[in-house]
């Protein structure tokens, strides 16, 4: 890279390229970016994501300069992937259209909440969760949802009609 950049590279870039690369765990990075700049010296730090390495949710205890992992939930059980499944089912692109679905949510009705709690998300007494994997395709295939999910919600995944897709892009 330094050969390609030649003298056009800033001196700081040359110095950075000679340093050792360090790996950081995905959820620990999220927890650190929330806890360390906060005004708290002690806090419970909860992170939720689609998936990072294998963790999809983590609970850390932040104390001073330390973050200690208390508990984590691993793939395929993921609230982020659950949300992405609904994003795809409603006709939006996964990892791109979630904010659109979130923006539309206040205009809908919670008529499927009981169905979701009964079949899709099982919440344990300790607050942990597990997905009803029989309804999803992301664990073993390339689709977020499967035919059982479609039967549960009485229809195939939606495709945005052209005129709506143009507005939503």
Regions found by a protein language model. Name each.
Residues 1-169:
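Short acidic/glycine-rich loops and adjacent helix/strand connectors
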């Amino acid at each position: 890279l330094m050969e390609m950049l030649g003298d056009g590279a800033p001196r700081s870039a040359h110095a950075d390229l000679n340093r050792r690369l360090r790996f950081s765990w995905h959820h620990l990075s999220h927890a650190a970016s929330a806890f360390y700049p906060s005004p708290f010296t002690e806090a419970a730090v909860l992170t939720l994501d689609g998936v990072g390495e294998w963790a999809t949710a983590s609970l850390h205890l932040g104390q001073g300069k330390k973050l200690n992992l208390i508990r984590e939930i691993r793939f395929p059980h993921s609230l982020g992937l659950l949300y992405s499944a609904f994003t795809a089912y409603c006709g939006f692109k996964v990892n791109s259209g979630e904010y659109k679905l979130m923006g539309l949510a206040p205009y809908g009705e919670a008529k499927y909440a009981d169905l979701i709690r009964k079949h899709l998300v099982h919440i344990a007494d300790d607050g942990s969760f597990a997905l009803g994997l029989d309804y999803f395709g992301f664990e073993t295939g390339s689709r977020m949802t499967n035919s059982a999910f479609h039967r549960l919600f009485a229809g195939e995944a939606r495709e945005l009609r052209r005129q709506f897709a143009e507005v939503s892009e």
